[in-house]
């Protein structure tokens, strides 16, 4: 499908490019005709040639408008080409198409670091099809803090948008025209909350009447040589320019930081228009106000250009009228503008999720239960290529807290991440990498990888104790899914074994659901004391004809094989 879309977008781009060049040539010819006809009109004092010259000038400006329209269509077609090329490269070569979200990585989080949620080749990197800074930020927020209460609504929204490939790509192409940054939203927020003193009623009336009186006085006075009218015109010119120069600093202050942002706001307007068409029930009605703001900022952009602004404001107070209109806009819409832009970001995230569902039609939407039970049939890691992915069945509930054993490299950590990622996908309303899934969407608590922090003076063991303390505190507040991988690695074997057993018993007392992976066989014997709560499962390795094999399939019971000694002998480390 992406190759078909790529071919269509390429043809459209070629078509618009030809039209763009044709209109550019027509503009040039029209301008030349306007110059020649205008010269003829002046030279011959002919009203007919003058009328034709005016028509040529009007046509020239119409062609400018047409040229801009075609330029926008050409940019959108080019963006669609890039979108489809990236999707093809992602599917065929595994090339991630967008930003990895590493800049949103929190210092501490219950699962983000352990499950590779952000950063290179992370879940964010895999899902992300956003372009705006705000879209990226919203995606990171949803991955880090999913709304577990609206899963079914999210599922329905994703299901509805998944088949709408053409609409999604059009929306994404328009979003790619937005060149935003964190500072833009900071400035916009500051501008929105900063009150602007409105122009007084007298000044509003004066800016309408004065240019009219000035223009009439100047025309009549100089045509009929009326000195009184000439004096009035000169006086009003001085007053008009004085008023303009008084307000120019206010105008510049009001638009400070928004120079040349009108094009970006217009791109936002295009995205909002698409949202209004696709989701009429939202009753957004924001595209027109955003377009108005874009035009007002555009109109005020040349206020500092004296060659333009002096004649404009002497004859019409043009910039003051636009400034007054901006004040009116601000008073009406300033509190709504950021939520409108956030709607674009939310739709970018929804398109990213729908894109994921579209790319993986074999994934399933999990059913939800209220019985604190997690059941996956043929669950696999969604970020592992299908031809390399090994799937397993698992059930976790009050009677099935799993003690997981396995030799080195047998797949324990990958399996824990598989469960964690699919639980997160469930909370996001996304389909999961499984044949069947029935899930209670429990909050995730994970401890799999930690590190020393020399700058903080904290050891690995101290960091792990802190993490376990945080997990226990969270479990006191609510029931959670816990995934722990080889805990207490920073202490001696006897202390580690005793500590691990006590932690597992504490997890059971707090009604946690989940898995603890361990190499310690004695820890696994704890299942005899809690036969109604604990079950042993394992991953095995096999040494056949001097070769180590893994099948990465989950089995019942405790791991029986060890491979550390074999690997060290193979590498010549030990005899």
Predicted regions and their residues:
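ATPase nucleotide-binding head domains, primarily ABC-like/P-loop NTPase cores
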Residues: 353, 360-575
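Alpha-helical coupling/stalk and coiled-coil linker elements that connect catalytic or binding modules
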Residues: 1-407, 414-444, 466-467
